[in-house]
Swiss-Prot record:
Keywords: Amino-acid biosynthesis, Aromatic amino acid biosynthesis, Cobalt, Cytoplasm, Lyase, Metal-binding, NAD, Nucleotide-binding, Zinc. NAD(+) binds at residues 104-108, 128-129, 141, 168-171. Its cofactor is Co(2+); Zn(2+); NAD(+). One of its GO terms (cellular component) is cytoplasm. This is 3-dehydroquinate synthase. InterPro entries: Dehydroquinate_synthase (IPR050071), DHQ_synth_AroB (IPR016037), DHQ_synth_fam (IPR030963), DHQS/DOIS_N (IPR030960), DHQS_C (IPR056179). The gene is aroB.
Amino acid sequence: MPQTLHVHSRVKDYDILFTNHVLKTLADCLGERKQRKLLFITDQTVYHLYQTLFEEFAQQYNAFVHVCPPGGQSKSLERVSAIYDQLIAENFSKKDMIVTIGGGVVGDLGGFVAATYYRGIPYIQIPTTLLSQVDSSIGGKVGVHFKGLTNMIGSIYPPEAIIISTTFLETLPQREFSCGISEMLKIGFIHDRPLFQQLRDFQKETDKQGLERLIYQSISNKKRIVEQDEFENGLRMSLNFGHTLGHAIESLCHHDFYHHGEAIAIGMVVDAKLAVSKGLLPKEDLDSLLQVFERYQLPTTLERADVSATSLFDVFKTDKKNSEQHIIFILPTETGFTTLAINKDDHQFVEKLDSLL
């Protein structure tokens, strides 16, 4: 497997580096910046799992650490403000750097701070979950939640580099592993059916090298899409398959009920059911999606939480993917994807949605 993927960006090109030697790879990335100040942003879970790693960072660099509570509540302007306070207190300049080590929450949060402190300072992402490695770290999207609305405030601000190491996945709980698989299945179902089939048959316990290949293949797919449509005007919208409903579920439900990859799985099932009902997708493809979700213990219905179609529809109206008058869904087809625009006043769709949940 190649060790590097180079991503072309209209903002700034960057490399995705595959390694099992995080310290050495980070040192190589920093180069002459080794003498600059570094702020490592992480969460309590990662910090306690890899405390020795952070101690080594402290020995080698002029480093500071900001440790967030785990979970989506840290993607907030209050947490951003706390990190600003630390950067200012330690006299961080525009030439100093942030390094995020954690899952998607940490990466999005740290990237947003980097994008906005002094109008932009450099940062490196080290994603530690499968979901963040194959999805949220790739493409430059950074941001935080606001007043219960998912990723409402943010930007596209690419990192200097992304360091991918599967060694972090050895401590990942099965539930979080399945959430990452959910995003890999998403891109496979829309863009790479051979990848989808490989994921369907994959045996995690006996095929570590196979996992590395699947991660590389998933990232390569997303890299290709992002390079063609960085600002989500066309092709990149396909990566929102499952996300209109998924983000609404996340907004309405406690994190304990549905993690991100689980909410997206339910969203994909509903999008696929809509596609079947409109003759865009064979029923056999929907059945295949349901079977593979069951294999990875991903939910396909909203049975864990009492959420109504009406409340979901109300949240849809605030989705940033919408046009002025329409709610946008991404529907899979036999050969790719299409968009479905639902009028924000179409209350008949609420009944349709209720029948699909």
